[in-house]
Amino acid sequence: PEGLTRAASAVKAAGGNALVLQMKAPGGTLSWKSGVSEAAAYGVNGTAELADAIRTVKGQNIYLVAVVSTCVDTLMAERYAATALQTASGSAYTDGSGGWVDPYNTFIRTYLVSLCKELHDMGFDEVAFSYLQQPLAATELKYASQSGTPSRTDAVVALAKYLRTNLSATGLRVSAIVSADSILQKQAELSGQDMTVLPKLFDRVCVFATADNVSTLQSAIAADSSFDAATRFVPFLAKAPESGSYVTTG
């Protein structure tokens, strides 16, 4: 909690108005003590009681964004094997990012929605989904609950639509962190991040960018005239640009 209030003070001192916090890491551990039963049942719950600190931060008119890892959840994939994303041979898929979970898995879907609803109730204004994608390796994947053979894009879009639909009544803003390659239409078939669909589903599209590529990325995503890139495209940058919406990662 003290770290949260210190971070909020730093944001205000820097002239910012929002704080982006990783609340569910790819490893699976939560950054707060959750009341969602599945978190305790599988030993992934955090210990921090954040309610008072969040009230303090909100009192400073700071906009709070929670980053929630979706398709990478190492601990859950290990501890509840049925949730793991499978290779064609039936083994759990893992890589340098961690253990991946099946985007069609009902447990994973309802767990994510429950966590996001709780974050909203705690005072978060927005959730940004990280790892809303599939692995970039060309390994053949198997979605255990699906009788057909959906593509990676099918899988990512299906999860995105589920999350959007089931959180719409909360008033929580829902965004996605996508890769620069997906915006530039590179590796999109592997990642499953269909940029003709995701910007239409989410309130904002976030991307880790650099000073060298941020304008190219913004132009690419702004090619869809229905997408207001000035307010809905949010680059994560090491250094603040002169204007526009952005998040600094320092």
Residue ranges and their predicted role:
Residues 32-41, 73-95, 137-147:
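Aromatic- and acidic-residue-enriched segments that line the glycan-binding/catalytic groove
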Residues 2-13, 39-63, 154-158:
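Aromatic- and glycine-enriched glycan-recognition loops and surfaces
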Residues 63-72, 128-129, 150-192, 227-240:
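Aromatic-lined carbohydrate-recognition surfaces of secreted/lumenal glycan-active proteins
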Residues 1, 34-46, 96-110, 147-151:
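The substrate-binding groove and active-site-proximal loops of carbohydrate-active enzymes
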Residues 1, 71-117:
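Active-site-adjacent "subsite" loops/lids of carbohydrate-active enzymes
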Residues 3-29, 118-128, 198-206:
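Catalytic domains of carbohydrate-active enzymes, especially glycoside hydrolases
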Residues 175-211, 247:
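Substrate-binding cleft/loops of secretory-pathway carbohydrate-active enzymes
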Residues 18-20, 46-93:
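Glycine-rich, aromatic-flanked loop segments that form ligand/cofactor-binding clefts
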